[in-house]
């Protein structure tokens, strides 16, 4: 599996975008990774997610939870490859929760699956729900880890690749200063 070049597959899938983007975190960036473009291709997704599955071989877990939207397909494919159950969390009235008959049992060891981790906000929201239900989060699995060095999640990250993409506060964004309109590609509602 080590001969898989995840960045090349992301590029082939048109998942790495250039422009001016308002991220779901509220920060701005000149690059964006739209993993939905990768995830629409099952064969490419299978290859990329196999890199994560390989990293999870030595991790003790029994269930995978993916936050909607980006983590749903990742959860499914990772569950398929690791032969573990895969479920998803979703927002109800703006609050992340486990619904649809899914459950986390006391003592479950959980991997949270994501497409992209930037600030870890969605993962941490899901972790809180899992822990309130009696589960233990043992890691976060993602296709792309694009966290800045100062962003900590308190959980190990198992990613298919690491991308260093600069982000900016609105007030420090050169693209805003040039009046270049932004695109809001993320799935979380902006306030």
Swiss-Prot record:
Q: Which CDD domains match?
A: PRTases_typeI
| Presence of the UniProt keyword Transmembrane helix in the record | no
Which InterPro entries does the record match to this protein?
OPRT, Orotate_PRibTrfase_bac, PRibTrfase_dom, PRTase-like
Task: Quote the record's binding site residues for 5-phospho-alpha-D-ribose 1-diphosphate.
Answer: 114-122
Q: Which UniProt keywords apply?
A: Glycosyltransferase, Magnesium, Pyrimidine biosynthesis, Transferase
User: What do we know about how this protein assembles, alone or with others?
Assistant: Homodimer.
NCBIfam families under this entry?
A: pyrE_Therm
Protein's name according to its UniProt entry: Orotate phosphoribosyltransferase
Give the species.
Answer: Clostridium botulinum (strain Langeland / NCTC 10281 / Type F)
């Amino acid at each position: 599996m080590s001969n898989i070049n995840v960045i090349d597959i992301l590029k082939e899938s048109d998942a790495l975008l250039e422009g001016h983007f308002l991220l779901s975190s509220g920060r701005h960036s000149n690059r964006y990774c739209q993993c939905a473009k990768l995830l629409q291709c099952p064969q490419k997704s299978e290859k990329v997610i196999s890199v994560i599955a390989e990293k999870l071989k030595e991790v003790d877990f029994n269930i995978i939870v993916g936050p909607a939207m980006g983590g749903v397909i990742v959860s499914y494919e990772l569950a398929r490859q690791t032969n573990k159950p895969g479920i998803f969390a979703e927002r109800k009235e703006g609050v992340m929760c486990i619904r649809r008959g899914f459950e986390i049992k006391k003592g479950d060891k959980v991997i949270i699956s994501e497409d992209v981790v930037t600030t870890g906000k969605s993962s941490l929201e899901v972790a809180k729900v899992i822990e309130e239900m009696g589960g233990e989060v043992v890691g976060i699995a993602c296709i792309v880890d694009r966290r800045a060095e100062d962003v900590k999640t308190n959980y190990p990250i198992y990613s298919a690749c690491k991308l260093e993409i600069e982000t900016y506060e609105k007030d420090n964004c050169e693209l805003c200063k040039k009046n270049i309109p932004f695109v809001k590609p993320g799935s979380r509602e902006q306030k």
